[in-house]
């Protein structure tokens, strides 16, 4: 009989998120993860702010995931955040290339498959 292997508590997106949090904090950002509970449905994964660069909402995505990366609530909330001056940036890893995205126009819509 094979021993029971417990399921991981968190998936690959959580590991990416933890790496991004460390990466941003090392660069002087304050990072506050959202909890993803029913009261925060549709909000991005991280609220970040920096003394020099201001605030960013960051949504963490697994680059290997297939299918629609956004929930219905995110598809409702993200455009409203952006329309009201709070962009949403998608990051798929803790790299310099991903970090550079935070200094360009918000990019969440690029992950929807819809051209703007």
Language-model segments: which ranges?
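Catalytic phosphate/metal-binding cores of nucleic-acid and nucleotide-processing enzymes, i.e., regions
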Residues: 1-116
């Amino acid at each position: 009989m094979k021993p029971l292997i417990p399921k991981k508590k968190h998936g690959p997106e959580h590991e990416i998120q933890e790496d991004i949090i460390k990466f941003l904090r090392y660069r002087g950002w304050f990072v506050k993860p959202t909890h993803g509970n029913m009261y925060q449905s549709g909000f991005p994964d991280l609220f970040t702010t920096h003394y020099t660069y201001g605030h960013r909402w960051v949504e963490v995505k697994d680059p290997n995931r297939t299918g629609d990366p956004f929930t219905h609530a995110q598809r409702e909330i993200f455009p409203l955040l952006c329309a009201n001056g709070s962009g949403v940036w998608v990051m798929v890893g803790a790299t310099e290339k991903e970090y550079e995205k935070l200094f360009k126009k918000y990019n969440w819509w690029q992950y929807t498959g819809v051209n703007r």
